[in-house]
Amino acid sequence: MLCFWRTSHVAVLLIWGVFAAESSCPDKNQTMQNNSSTMTEVNTTVFVQMGKKALLCCPSISLTKVILITWTITLRGQPSCIISYKADTRETHESNCSDRSITWASTPDLAPDLQISAVALQHEGRYSCDIAVPDGNFQNIYDLQVLVPPEVTHFPGENRTAVCEAIAGKPAAQISWTPDGDCVAKNESHSNGTVTVRSTCHWEQSHVSVVFCVVSHLTTGNQSLSIELGRGGDQLLGSYIQYIIPSIIILIIIGCICLLKISGCRKCKLPKSGATPDIEEDEMQPYASYTEKSNPLYDTVTTTEAHPASQGKVNGTDCLTLSAMGI
């Protein structure tokens, strides 16, 4: 849901951040001669996107009257770095300064402003420019804040839900939805100061098919991303029709092909099995012929062997019996 206070808050931050977008500082040699009207101390919060160039300006004081210019840089967790320029000797001096990306914008006698070539998260901190002149001291103080654009992802979830995520942004991104839904947001802070925001929303209304996730951040403005919702039971039915039915049809086709192959193989084997009895019958023919031919011999041999065994007992009845057997 879009909230007015969130939108206003973003707008205010953008206005504060305009200063960081300046590419040049006022010409110190064209400032008013009456420096008494200049504020002695100015505090400014500066927002710079990571990877961009930052330019921090000293007070608009005529350099012809400058005695000493000093930049004091206090980064988180580090000792203060001091960069100074002495006008009478034109000497520069550095103390506890190791970051080579932080330098003078030009030669100090022409432009004592400070520049950071590529802003990183470790450059967050306090930057102070002090200018000493015969009339007093003037100071510009900057609280430098680094902006990190988040990586945005969005995707549909289950049961008519949608997820929108802004990963590792600084400051934390704001996420809203159109139309409104039942939403839950979760923030996860990281050790480097960035924040991941994850918003999950659910819509009961079946007529809502497309929703919009709006991600608001200082570096990117408002991004509107569309997400197509699933249709619950209709979606399951669609998945069933789309995936399951074609699979079943493919299985049926494969089964029919297998059955046709099996049936064809059986038909090919049937003539071979029908010819087998003929072969067996042909193989048995010689044995059958031999038996028929050998039976008379067997009978003759049996008769011949029976006659000698009966010769010692031949009498009237036995002779008739033997004669009958011989016939």
Swiss-Prot record:
The keyword Membrane is assigned to this record: yes
Topology class, membrane: Single-pass type I membrane protein
Tissue and organ expression note: Restricted to cells of the myeloid lineage.
Segments crossing the lipid bilayer: 240-260
Domain Ig-like V-type: 26-145
Modification after translation (UniProt): Phosphorylated on tyrosine residues. Highly N-glycosylated.
Occurrences of domain Ig-like C2-type (ranges): 147-226
Keyword terms, alphabetized: Cell membrane, Disulfide bond, Glycoprotein, Membrane, Phosphoprotein, Receptor, Signal, Transmembrane, Transmembrane helix
Subcellular location field: Cell membrane
Disulfide bond among keywords: yes
Extracellular topological segments: 24-239
SS bonds (residue pairs): C58-C129, C81-C97, C164-C213, C183-C201
Oligomer and partners: CD200 and CD200R1 interact via their respective N-terminal Ig-like domains.
Name of this protein: Cell surface glycoprotein CD200 receptor 1
Origin organism lineage: Eukaryota, Metazoa, Chordata, Craniata, Vertebrata
